[in-house]
């Protein structure tokens, strides 16, 4: 079965318009808007993974928050103790800023004003 060049060109000339005709009839223009609820399997899986990650980091977040609160309480207590030490009736009491304690000038021991 020998196909000559002229037969190939003739076949191509016949098939090309047919292919174009089919492609134009298959293509249809739609004006529909599809709105999804967002409740697809993929979005549910993503939400589950995010929740799992959030729960995994919960312990770390709690530790950071506790440490921050502890440091805040320590600074707040030191501020109150400094005020008490400076307003103390004891003339030998002084505030030591490095150790955040009220000390006796003579002995160096901690004083509770």
Swiss-Prot record:
Record has Signal as a keyword: yes
Keyword vocabulary terms for this entry: Signal
Signal sequence, start to end: 1-28
Tagged with keyword Endoplasmic reticulum: no
Stated family: Belongs to the UPF0482 family.
Protein name listed in UniProt: UPF0482 protein YnfB
Annotated source species: Escherichia coli O1:K1 / APEC
The organism's taxonomic lineage, starting at the top: Bacteria, Pseudomonadati, Pseudomonadota, Gammaproteobacteria, Enterobacterales
């Amino acid at each position: 079965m020998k196909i000559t060049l002229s037969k190939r060109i003739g076949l191509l000339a016949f098939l090309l318009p047919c292919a174009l005709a089919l492609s134009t009839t298959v293509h249809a223009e739609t004006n529909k808007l599809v709105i999804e609820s967002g409740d697809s399997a993929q979005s549910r899986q993503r939400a589950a993974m995010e929740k799992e990650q959030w729960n995994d980091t919960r312990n770390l977040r709690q530790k950071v928050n506790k440490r921050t609160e502890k440091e805040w309480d320590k600074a707040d207590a030191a501020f109150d103790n400094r005020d008490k030490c400076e307003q103390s009736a004891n003339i030998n009491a002084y505030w030591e800023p490095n150790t955040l304690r009220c000390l006796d000038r003579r002995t160096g021991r901690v004083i509770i004003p």
